[in-house]
Amino acid sequence: MHHTQHNTMANSIPKLLATQNPFSVSLSIFFFLLLLINNVKSDSLSFNFPKFDTDALNIVIDGDAKTTGGVLQLTKKDQFGNPSPHSVGFSAFFGAIQLSDKQSGKVADFTTEFSFVVNPKGSQLHGDGFAFYIASLDYDFPEKSSDGGFLGLFDKETAFNTSKNSIVAVEFDSFANEWDPNSPHIGIDINTIESSISVPWPIDRQPQGTIGKARISYNTASKDLSVFVTYPNSPAKVDVIVSYPIDFASVLSEWVYVGFSGATGQVAETHDILSWSFVSNL
């Protein structure tokens, strides 16, 4: 299959939608179009990006995100590679994924793996983090004010309003906001920026630039979403494990899209995804 990178949503949708903010309304309509033109009725789906080539991707990017040097860069850097404050970036796999089937009652098992680097580039302060998300096709990403602790997923109007949201995320949160634990943490978020469960994330104990590896999996039988994070080449041998029960059929629509978001606030760090794979079986 030929893979095409989609740098702006307006280039991929009718001109009527080009006037909409590409980070909100048009995303919802865009992914509804994906449901019509770019899904395959199948019991299984898989994709693999060993690296992110700028000219050979099935990836949607928006905000400050871009692909460069084989890397998916979620938030902005300056000309010297240093992280920029108040940056928000977004990416998604270019295809709708069937997570559940109401008629049969089935919910998909899935596993996604990715490698990443979070680097404050010389600073001792981290901020703010990134997330892997699964969102219903009609989920409205915020138009603005989603930087900092909102991680690009929410704004102050939606962050704690679970009735407005239809998204599940695993957050890699490096800055303690008022709704957070008092240290860097990895959390599972269900329709809100406040994690249902979280565990410490020793990002501040890793040498700057260290590559992390994450595996996120969902087991339909147990309904557990499980997260495992490790730094295999780091002298600080600390693994992170967390899991939480989720009934995806009651939280999200049958068809979803998956991807990453990242954000910085006044304090900044880089958020780079080096590789990404995903497999699901319904």
From Swiss-Prot:
Primary residence: membrane
Keywords for the protein's UniProt record, in alphabetical order: Glycoprotein, Lectin, Membrane, Transmembrane, Transmembrane helix
CDD domains membership: lectin_legume_LecRK_Arcelin_ConA
GO annotation, biological process: response to symbiotic fungus
Glycosylated residue positions: N161
Gene Ontology terms, MF aspect: carbohydrate binding
Disulfide bonds: none
Upregulation: Accumulates in roots, in a RAM1-dependent manner, during colonization by arbuscular mycorrhizal (AM) fungi (e.g. Glomus versiforme and G.intraradices).
InterPro entries (UniProt xref): ConA-like_dom_sf, L-lectin, Lectin_LegA_CS, Lectin_legB_Mn/Ca_BS, Legume_lectin_dom, Leguminous_Lectin
GO cellular component entries: membrane
Keyword match ATP-binding: no
Cytoplasmic-facing ranges: 1-16
Domain of life the protein comes from: Eukaryota
Compartments (UniProt record): Membrane
Similarity section: Belongs to the leguminous lectin family.
PANTHER family linked: CONCANAVALIN A-LIKE LECTIN FAMILY PROTEIN, LECTIN 5
Function per UniProt: May be involved in arbuscular mycorrhizal (AM) symbiosis with AM fungi.
Protein name listed in UniProt: Lectin 5
Organism expressing this protein natively: Medicago truncatula
Gene: LEC5
